[in-house]
Amino acid sequence: MSTGRQGIWLCPECGNHEPWKTRDRETNQIDRKCSNCDKRARVTLNRSNSGKGRKRNYQIWEREPTIDFGKIIEEAKKRNNKTLKNEVIRSKSEKATQEQLPPIWGLDWAPKNALFFTKKLPEKKVRKELLRFVAERHDGYLELISEVWISMQPSAQFNGETYHKFTKQFCQEVSKSLDERIWKPELSIIEGEEVIPMRDTELYLKRRNKRFMRDIRLCLRRVAYASSVDLDTHLQWQRWMTRTRAMDEHLKDLFSNGISTPDGGKFGGKGFRSTWQEGVVGCATSLNRAIDLSPENRHLADIIAPMIRDVGLALAVGQTPLEIFASQMGKSGSYMDGGNLDSGGRDLHIGNWEKGVLPPTAPLPIASATATGIALAAKLLKINRFHLAPVGEGCSSNGEFWEAMNLAGARGLPIAFMIQNNQIALDTFTVGQSGAETFGDKGHAMGIPSWTIDGSDPLQFHASTAASREYALDGGGPTLIHVETMRGCGHAHHHDDLYLGSVTGNPPGYVGRELLSYWAEKDPLPNHRDYCISIGANEKQLISMEKEEQAIVDAARKEMEEMPWPEGNTVTKGVTSRHDAESHTEQFERFEKDSREILSGPLNDGDLAIEFSNAPNSSTYSRAIQNAMVALAERHENDIVFMGEDMEVAGAFGMNIPLKAKGHSSKLLDMPLSESIIINSATGAALGGMRPVAEIQFGGF
């Protein structure tokens, strides 16, 4: 057993690895000659926790003295012989093969350009956020990340350029340290062993390293985006949050008191608010908004699929207070009109397709699943468009949401999912929704990068969405942003007393007082307002803005109240693109007809209009369908996709063989075994500009 120090050094001249050892532990220098090129190395040893010295131009790996020196020699030989497999992490073939491993989207993604920082960024602030994220998602790497960071001796402050350069070098060093793990003699016992069938240690760890480094680069990029925000952007967020809070107060009043209806009654409209969740407006400044584009280019705008707490986000991307009021109160001018002017009120949700806002849906995940289909169309049509799908933690329990994330993860779609944990879904506490440590763990299960942000801070929404968008449009695929927040109101307006408690104390309210106090102190409006002042905003300017926003919302409410109610007969218009629906009167008239009356047909009983042939070249239903599919493929070219189960090999019963024979293999898309996402994503793909043909393989499914 050695009593000195030992390890391996790398010759900078020829790249040969040489073993070394000293007589005792006190020796801190080695003087050796390379056996390959005779280059002499005189190096001062610098022990590091990663086992790697960084002095001069030499790389030194020190091993524990308890390890047999023969294993050190063997390690050097392996390094020189390059015995670590240079496996392909992801197949480069256009179509999947059975042996192919799951794709790692964003495999070696890194930001291309530096961002401009509005002020110097303290090194300690970056390190703190980096270690916080590693503690959240990869706690086993805390010491490694800290050791490599400190060893690189960063400057006390960064600007955009120096930060970009340093973090690029930092990621390279961390990646090298991760790759070194398998060389350590104490791990040689699992060398070549399968971690799981068909994935040996080297390959498995290499893939894990790639995923880890992807997460680290995204974390550092979020820090960069947060450092590039100026005062004007903060003031814009404050304006949007103020507008949202003013809307909330009006919506509460409308629900409580109602407005007069033509029949002499009262109607209070939809009953949802966004209290304490207004910070989501920060996402909008990271998006390519439709309202900022010319009409002919609005199909290139980013798409959002907000839920009921995301009124602020809808306002921030361009919906007006009048649009929100009209939709929530079901007035004729609502965009929920089925495409027929003055026929609003069919649904009481927000939404405006021309502005890139999908309406929320009562089956909660439908909007997210549809947005996933729109993202699929963007990828297939090579449209540079990003998609954002926020939901609550309750919705994340739904199978259709999982199906959407799974498809996005499998196909690398340009979408960010956002799970906003506001601590309760109606009256179901978070502990009843999931056993995962964080809701971000759900993304990890799909191979999707995920992280957590504080939902009271619009800056974190902005930075996360910006990083997700850049990553997605660079080909990295989907991300999952987990938001910890809390709703400061009941599920709906009528629910406040049960949730928060009545002013009389009866009912007392069931929400935890400690939880309520914690999040009340984080209310984004007053806190962000104070922050704006701390970085240079003018108090008078803020007061003026607040009065202006209140006046805008007040005027919108007045205009909504003067807007006519929809005529009842408009509800049947445009239910499909081909025909109107029957009115109740028309349905009753049809029911009242004698059901025993049999209309005369063109044929008598037993007669056939078509004789079916038994000839081998005769047409069949399946052949007619095959011919129709080929005709559609040739008519619509790259705008069509045939999507379903088992599409890319041949299709059930060989239905897709003619398509492949005619050169249309690229139009076939295998879908996960999830019938709901097949239909929902096909719907989204149609909205996104494609002609999807969705196939459910068997009727019994």
Residue ranges and their predicted role:
Residues 77-282, 297, 489-663:
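Conserved acidic/glycine
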Residues 403-407, 676-693:
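Small-aliphatic-rich amphipathic alpha-helix that forms the alpha element of a beta-alpha
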Residues 18-19, 41-43:
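Cys/His-rich microdomains that often coordinate metals
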Residues 1-7, 24-26, 44-84:
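Short, intrinsically disordered terminal segments enriched in charged and Pro/Gly residues
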Residues 12-13, 36:
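Short, cysteine/histidine-rich loop/knuckle motifs that typically chelate Zn2+
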Residues 106-111, 117-118, 123-130, 141, ...:
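Glycine-rich ThDP/TPP pyrophosphate-binding loop and its adjacent helix/strand module
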